[in-house]
Amino acid sequence: MGCEVSKLSALCCVSESGRSNPDVTGLDEEGRGESNDLPQFREFSIETIRNATSGFAAENIVSEHGERAPNVVYKGKLENQRRIAVKRFNRKSWPDSRQFLEEAKAVGQLRNHRMANLLGCCYEDEERLLIAEFMPNETLAKHLFHWESQPMKWAMRLRVALHIAQALEYCTSKGRALYHDLNAYRVLFDDDANPRLSCFGLMKNSRDGKSYSTNLAFTPPEYLRTGRVTPESVIYSFGTLLLDLLSGKHIPPSHALDLIRDRNIQMLMDSGLEGQFSSDDGTELIRLASRCLQYEPRERPNPKSLVSAMIPLQKDLEIASHQLLGVPNSATTTALSPLGEACLRSDLTAIHEIIEKLGYKDDEGATTELSFQMWTDQMQDTLVFKKKGDSAFRHKDFAKAIECYSQFIEVGTMGSPTVHARQSLCYLMNDMPREALNNAMQAQVISPAWHIASYLQAVALSALGQENEAHTALKDGAMLESKRNPL
């Protein structure tokens, strides 16, 4: 039982050797490619989203300003292992749930490979949540303004501009020409490091809220006059995005236009791009940015013409986006630890040995022996259940361990991810994969960044015959472990 090679192992081998290179450019019909592999828009329960985000845990916040942001974005994972991004609006936003649902449904009909698409929403009680595809390779702002090893390459910057222009052209063709507060934080990079436009900007932050949250120096002049966003305002914001790509800085449009008028182009261009582009290409992109930033809205180009202007400028089309951006390819398998290898093989005997040796090192201090000894009589009784479960686990009496750990969990005085992980393995040993999956998911709720929870989910999913989901969970576990124990 413990040493058989699992279907998950076979699947992982195929994914490494049999995956074809992804389409790098996607220059098909101006980026109108529909994403047909996504589920239809749906309404989620608050319980589902709480479970997916580990109770809106701080560790799962991915928005730039963390908990201080007016509308916080969390990462999460559904039961089917699909990774999601959850935008949680301020409680005073969208007081009318019907209006919120109507807007979300309209945006949720869009499906395009140039966008991080909206999968659903939740409007239970006072909550207003948007649920979208999760993009794991961060934002344009991170890669452009806060890079660590090298500045973003010219070819990648051009690819960003094209993909976002294609996304805007698609939205316009579907009757959603308004995009609120387009900026470098709205551009995300998917598993393959291809740039995508966040769907969140297609809805305002509240029913009657502002369309722009950035510094007023970057807002379209007509918005300052009227307070209304128009399709032409979106083009102006695209122009500010082009300035970001040209300069590597978030430079006010008025200052950039002064530099352009004075022909002081060197002051505008990012010095890290030296030698990567011709003067003609640089001039053409500056000219396009200037057109987008025209004071009169009617003088600005439309999205279709932006796409037409960007296509001839593309460089290094044969190089995949992950190489240009300098991030690992989604098809690349992270080197697995002994525990990861054991989970890949569904080698339950090896998993048991590793988890037994680990003990409770990964639990928070509240679950240590010292803490238990300081607690009340009820908690002392709880400790007895845990100790009996640990003894049964050590001696491989897995049915007894399940019974004792269940008593510990039912008391509910505290959450121990290790207890849930151990019980999950006990269920696997007793050929109860559904129960094992539930325990592994509960361990992740308590400790969202714990790799062992993802690994055990992978083993349980494989036992349930859900091989694709198991592969995803295994990759997630390997990624979390590599972050926890960097080389």
Swiss-Prot record:
Q: Which family does it belong to?
A: Belongs to the protein kinase superfamily. Ser/Thr protein kinase family.
Covalent S-S links between cysteines: none
| List of catalytic residues | D181
PTM entry text: Phosphorylated by BRI1, ASK7/BIN2 and ASK9/BIL2.
Instruction: Please cite one Gene Ontology biological process associated with this protein.
Output: brassinosteroid mediated signaling pathway
Q: Which UniProt keywords apply?
A: ATP-binding, Brassinosteroid signaling pathway, Cell membrane, Kinase, Lipoprotein, Membrane, Myristate, Nucleotide-binding, Phosphoprotein, Serine/threonine-protein kinase, Transferase
Q: Which E.C. number(s) belong to this protein?
A: 2.7.11.1
Sites of N-myristoyl glycine lipidation: G2
Protein kinase domain spans which residues?
59-325
Annotated protein name in UniProt: Serine/threonine-protein kinase BSK8
Q: Note the superkingdom of the native organism.
A: Eukaryota
Any one GO CC term of this protein is:
plasma membrane
Q: What class of enzyme is it?
A: transferase
GO MF entries: ATP binding; protein serine kinase activity; protein serine/threonine kinase activity
Q: How does it assemble?
A: Interacts with ASK7/BIN2, BSK1, BSK5, BSK6 and BSK11. Interacts with BSL2.
Reply yes or no: does the keyword Chaperone apply.
Answer: no
* Gene it is expressed from: BSK8
Give the result of S20A, as annotated: Phosphorylation null-mimic mutant
